[in-house]
Each structure stands twice: as C-alpha cells, then as structure tokens.
C-alpha cells in the first residue's frame, strides 16, 4: 500500500499543478476583459490554449482513474510505468506554469510594442516636419525672425531627444529589454537551424536543388542581394541552394575562398532532371531548377520580400520594428560566415583602426552612383544627423569622443571631413576608398575593402547613409543580426529601405487625411497606400490604391502592412 500512497501523492500534485495552470490562465482572461480594445485574435489564441489545457487535464484525469487501487493483484511494472509518465507530465506542467509567469512578467504584448514604435515614429516625423516648416520661416523677413526660428529649432531638438530617450527607457523597463534579447536570440537560432537543415541533406543525389549563379552584372552588395533572393526562393520551395561562384569577378576561386560554403554536404548540381524556373507548381517534378535574376523571374512566387513567414509573424511583430528586414537579414547572416583568414583580417583591422564605441557609421557613395541612381550629397548633410544622434546618445551614455567610421569611394573625402569637423575623430582606411574606385572595383583587394567597410558600418551604434546604395542596405541588414531590434538605428538621406525586386510595399491608413494642396492625396482609415518613399519632412509619397491617386500624405497617419506567406516550417530541423 505504501507504493500506492506515493503514487497518489504524485497524482494529487499533478492535478493540483494543472488546476493552478488553468486558474492562472483563467485569471488572465478575466483581466483582459478590462481592456475592451484587446484584439479578438489574441483572445481566441488564449481560448485555444485553454481548450488544449482542458483536454490535457481530462487526459490526466483518465490516467489517474486507471491508477486507482484495483481489486485483486497489482501489476507493479505497469503501475510504475504509468507513474513515470505522470512524473514527466508534472515536470512539463511546472515548466508551462513558469513560462506563463515569465510571459506575464516580461512579454508586454504585441499591441504595447506596436504602440511604442508608433509613438517613436510619430515623434520623429513631427521633428522632420517642424524642421522643414520652420526653416522656411528664415527666408520670410528680417534677422529677428531668423534668430527666433533658430531658437525654436534648438528647443524642439531638446524636446525630441527627451521623448526619444524616454521611449528608449520604456523599451527596457520591467524586464522588456531582457525579454526582447531572449526572444530575438530564440527566433534567430530557430531560423538558422531551419536553414542549416535545408542546406545539408543526408543524400545530395536525391535532394531537390535550386541553382543560383553569383555572377550577376553588378557590384558586391548587389550580388549578395541576388544570392539572398535565390536563397529565399530555395527556402520557400524546400530546395537546397547550390551556389555557382567559380570565376567570380571578385575572387576567381569562388565564394568559398572568402566565406564558408553554403552547404557542407551538397554542392553538386547534378540530378535526374534539370529545368529553368517555371513556377513552384510546374517545377514540382523537376529535381534541379535554375533560377534567373529577379528582374527576369516569371512567374513570381510569394516568397519575395517584403513578406515574412506566417508561423513567425506574430513573434516578429512584437520583437522587431521591421520584420521584413529581419527576415532578409537571417539569410545574409548565414551567407557571410567568414573563413578563418577573413575573420583574422577583421580582428586585425579593428585593432589597427582603433574602432570602438560609441561610433556612428557614415557611408558616402559617389563615383558611378551620382547622377544615375543617386543625387550628390555633401558631407554636411550627413554630419547634421551624426551630431543629432551623438546628442541623443549623450542622454544615456558617456560620450568620451565623437567617433565616425567613414566609408566612401571618394579618397578626397576623409581629408575634407577632418578639416571641416575637427572636433570629431574619423576612423577610415583610405586604401579602401582607392580600391573602391571604378578602375579597381572588381579585384580581391576591393572585395576585402568592401567587406571591411560593411562590417564596421554594421557594428556602429547608428548609421547615416543613402539607402539607394546596396552597401548601405547590406550594412543595415547585418546590423539587425547584432541587436534585438536595430530597425530605427539609421538615417537615410534618400530612399526608405527596399530590396531590389521586392513585391509592393504597402501601408495602411490609420487616420483620415484631407488634402490641403493639389500635391496631397485623401485617405480614410483602412485605405491601402502603396509607398514610394519618405521625404523625411513629415510627408511620404505614395498611391492610394482604392482611389488610384498618387501624391503626398502625412507619414504619421499610416502604419506598415505586414505581408505574410506560408513558408515551410521544417519540423525535421528540431529533431
């Protein structure tokens, strides 16, 4: 009877644990009713969890019934086995209780995070607007008006930095910073496991493959993004990426001489059948599919940016300000794992240059971009935002020196910057600027230079650049892999973030807007706006898809429309 007394203690403990868990979740349901604006979607998820727990509780009840002392002889082996199962269930129950407690303590909820980021964006957009409008007043009349306008701008700068500092501390309060750190790490590890599983099939001869040739006719940043696009299609169609990089214009030995191979088990493109991309469904019986550049892709699959995986979307929206960039960054992270020699080169360059924090990264693209894809921007335009961000950093950390990592393809710019801004410490390697020139661009030395520039730009506390440049966007993408959420750690002098060949970038109107000029478009809440760009003056430009009208609209009156797609989830990667 003593053995059975011990068993019943376990049973009572299990039932008590599950009862506690049910009560705990039930309490959350009651508290949520105090907030009528809480989304029905979140409520239904909690109810679904509750239903599952009720079912598990019923299963345990039946198991407990089966362990009642029977009339007649006792099968000790069977009873011991059942008790062991119940012990395991108890451990799981305790873990779930702790997880729910942690979520309540640290997870502030998706709506809280969305609101926090909207306040942050609204404050910044207000600042852009006021700067633009008040600067216009300088030219109206008299020195007095100009002096007064300068004072207003100065005061507004203090206000804006105060708001941004408060928001930063809000983002870290009540364990939110620790939660965000852990959640971002968990999501990254999950995605990297899935990619690693896909890229390392047990039998390469039977694996479904997608072939991507790196030699697109463009520079390093563009070629890297080309491979990322291939990788995302491979991931979505459950095909192992085969990267063809021999005679790469930057390194004739191929990708693997610089970065780690994209696969340890499968680099051979051979297969029973081969064909050019004709769509996921049409290619289902083709083992090896060759992918064209994104400009020639037809039909276009749903896996292109700016879409994110459906199964990760809710978690990503909570933890990151731009889920689409985070998703792209995961493929960049996997691709640019350095070979040992490159890792050593980066370490030596870090020491030689004296790269340390706090530091702001500035990327100035000149040469072939100016006059074609981008306008000329003097160094003064960049340094305005550098100074603003150093003043913001000084609110929450000690700024011993105002360091700037300057990356440019204009060798004369470093001297100009040092002359004009002697109170800054410029960190730069002018040999990289020379190697980035048009005549030296496609060499191994140039590749080393652009990799180092991108590395240090991504390591900076803040990035000032032009998003029309692929190098700048790559640095921004890598930056996302180094922090839980670095989506706001930049200022672009021209474009908003985009991925070449992406699907439409849409926003949703949250406030109505009545045009005041012919340049503006009307909006009603819920309208879908196809965004063309942000003018960084409080207004963006786009098309109201319902009305078919293109024009300006206040940036704060919209929010991002998160596009999701049903990507494979690769459960085998967790085994």
UniProtKB/Swiss-Prot annotation:
Q: Which residues carry this modification: Phosphoserine?
A: 278
Q: Where in the cell is it found?
A: Golgi apparatus, Golgi stack membrane
* Cysteine pairs bridged by disulfides in the record: 204-266, 212-230, 218-222, 465-472
Kindly report every residue range on the membrane side named Cytoplasmic: 1-9
Query: Which regions of this chain are Lumenal-facing, per the record's topological domains?
Result: 31-575
Gene Ontology CC terms, in alphabetical order: Golgi cisterna membrane
MF terms per GO, please?
A: alpha-(1->6)-fucosyltransferase activity; glycoprotein 6-alpha-L-fucosyltransferase activity; glycosyltransferase activity; SH3 domain binding
- The EC number of this protein is 2.4.1.68
* Catalytic activity entry: N(4)-{beta-D-GlcNAc-(1->2)-alpha-D-Man-(1->3)-[beta-D-GlcNAc-(1->2)-alpha-D-Man-(1->6)]-beta-D-Man-(1->4)-beta-D-GlcNAc-(1->4)-beta-D-GlcNAc}-L-asparaginyl-[protein] + GDP-beta-L-fucose = an N(4)-{beta-D-GlcNAc-(1->2)-alpha-D-Man-(1->3)-[beta-D-GlcNAc-(1->2)-alpha-D-Man-(1->6)]-beta-D-Man-(1->4)-beta-D-GlcNAc-(1->4)-[alpha-L-Fuc-(1->6)]-beta-D-GlcNAc}-L-asparaginyl-[protein] + GDP + H(+)
- Domain named SH3: which ranges? 502-563
Q: Which residues form the GT23 domain?
A: 206-493
| Major subcellular site | Golgi
Modification after translation: Tyrosine phosphorylated by PKDCC/VLK.
**Motif SH3-binding per UniProt: ranges:** 299-305
Residues crossing the lipid bilayer are: 10-30
Query: Is Transmembrane given among the entry's keywords?
Result: yes
Record's function text: Catalyzes the addition of fucose in alpha 1-6 linkage to the first GlcNAc residue, next to the peptide chains in N-glycans.
Name of the protein in its database record: Alpha-(1,6)-fucosyltransferase
The species is: Rattus norvegicus (Rat)
């Amino acid at each position: 009877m003593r053995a059975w007394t011990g068993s019943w203690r376990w049973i009572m403990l299990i039932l008590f644990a599950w009862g506690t868990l049910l009560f705990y979740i039930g309490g959350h349901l009651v508290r949520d009713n105090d907030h009528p604006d809480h989304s029905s979607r979140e409520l239904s998820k909690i109810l679904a969890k509750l239903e599952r727990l009720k079912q598990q509780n019923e299963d345990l009840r039946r198991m407990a019934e089966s362990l009642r002392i029977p009339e007649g002889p006792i099968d000790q082996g069977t009873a011991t086995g059942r008790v062991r199962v119940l012990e395991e269930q108890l451990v799981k129950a305790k873990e779930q209780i702790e997880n729910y407690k942690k979520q309540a303590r640290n997870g502030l909820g998706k709506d809280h995070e969305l609101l926090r980021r909207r306040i942050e964006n609204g404050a910044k957009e207000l600042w852009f607007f006021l700067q633009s409008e008040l600067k216009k007043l300088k030219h109206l009349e008299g020195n007095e008006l100009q002096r007064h306008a300068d004072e207003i701008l100065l005061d507004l700068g203090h206000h804006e930095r105060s708001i941004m500092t408060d928001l930063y501390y809000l983002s870290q309060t009540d364990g939110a910073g620790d939660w965000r750190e852990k959640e971002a790490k968990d999501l990254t590890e999950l995605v990297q496991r899935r990619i690693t599983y896909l890229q390392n099939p047990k039998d390469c001869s039977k694996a479904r493959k997608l072939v991507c040739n790196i030699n697109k006719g463009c520079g390093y940043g563009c070629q890297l993004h080309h491979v990322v696009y291939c990788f995302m299609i491979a991931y979505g169609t459950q095909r192992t990426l085969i990267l063809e990089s021999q005679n790469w214009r930057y390194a004739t030995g191929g990708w693997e001489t610089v970065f780690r191979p994209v696969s340890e088990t499968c680099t051979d493109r051979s297969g029973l059948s081969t064909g050019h991309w004709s769509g996921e469904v049409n290619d289902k019986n083709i083992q090896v599919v060759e992918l064209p550049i994104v400009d020639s892709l037809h039909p276009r699959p749903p896996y292109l940016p700016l879409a994110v995986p459906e199964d990760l979307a809710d978690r990503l929206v909570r933890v990151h300000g731009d889920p689409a960039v985070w998703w792209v960054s995961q493929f960049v992270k996997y691709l640019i794992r350095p070979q040992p020699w490159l890792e050593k080169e980066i370490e030596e360059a870090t020491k030689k240059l004296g790269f340390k924090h706090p530091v702001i990264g500035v990327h100035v693209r000149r040469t072939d971009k100016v006059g074609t894809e981008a306008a000329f921007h003097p160094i003064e335009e960049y340094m305005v935002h550098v100074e603003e961000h150093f003043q913001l950093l000084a609110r929450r950390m000690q700024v011993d020196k105002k360091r700037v990592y300057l990356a440019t393809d204009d060798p004369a710019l470093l001297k100009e910057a040092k002359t004009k801004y002697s109170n800054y410490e410029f960190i730069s390697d002018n040999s990289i600027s020379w190697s980035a020139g048009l005549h030296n661009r496609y060499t191994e030395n140039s590749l080393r230079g652009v990799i180092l520039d991108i590395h240090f730009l991504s390591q900076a506390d803040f990035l000032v650049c032009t998003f029309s440049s692929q190098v700048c966007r790559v640095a921004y993408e890598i930056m996302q892999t180094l922090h839980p959420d670095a989506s706001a750690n930049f200022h672009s002098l021209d474009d908003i973030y985009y991925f070449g060949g992406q699907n439409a970038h849409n926003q949703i109107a949250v406030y109505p807007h009545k045009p005041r000029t012919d340049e503006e478009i009307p909006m009603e809440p819920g309208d879908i706006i196809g965004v063309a760009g942000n003018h960084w003056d409080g207004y963006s430009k786009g098309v109201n898809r319902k009305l078919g009208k293109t024009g300006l609209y206040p940036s704060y009156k919209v929010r991002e429309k998160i596009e999701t797609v049903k990507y494979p989830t690769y459960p085998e990667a967790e085994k």
